[in-house]
Amino acid sequence: AFHGRTMGALALTHKAAYREPFEPLPGGVEFIPAGDIEALRGALGPDVAALIVEPIQGEAGVRELPAGYLEAARELTEAVGALLIIDEVQSGMGRSGAWMAHHLLAPGVVPDVVTLAKGLGGGIPIGAVVATGEAAALLGPGQHGTTFGGNPVACAAALAVIDTVRSQDLLVRVEQLGSAWARELAAVDGVNEVRGRGLLIGVGLAEGLPPAGEIAATLLAERGFIVN
């Protein structure tokens, strides 16, 4: 899983290369295999505060959780009194063809918390934590804060993004473009798998070829694009 690079989020991120330069990190975190319901069942108990998952794992190669996993996660977390947190930082705000990727994968699941950033601001830095039900009452005024939280410019940008996605039917457009790209990519020599939803796409290449991201970055840089 990848949940961020600041200390709290980094503690929830599995990749050693990101973690090691900043260790020791906050503890009390257990990693389990994504999509493994039995592993989840074994890990959850009354001492667990929350489960955090990406509906489509970006850093892992654009791999979505299998059918039924989020439903099981919701049922199991409720049974032990743990929060279900869905990280939609990469997959949310329309990138998957829906406002949230979990709307596609598990339409009936309502998480306690959703985390958002990236596409929320349309290029302006902003992050948000959306909480529902009892989880929404866990933090009150003065308990936690950030210097630039509620920044009016960033919030105005987020409102403009939401309005644009709605007014221009961009969710439909994302689905159309994603389907077209997937078809075109699947026809390219050396491509053996196209994964993802909407415009959140991962490409698997035949053995012996460089990673797809490396090839794409080289071609984009040659054409004058800045690539991260």
Which residues fall in each region the model found?
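Conserved N-terminal phosphate-binding loop of PLP-dependent enzymes in the Aspartate aminotransferase
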Residues: 1-228
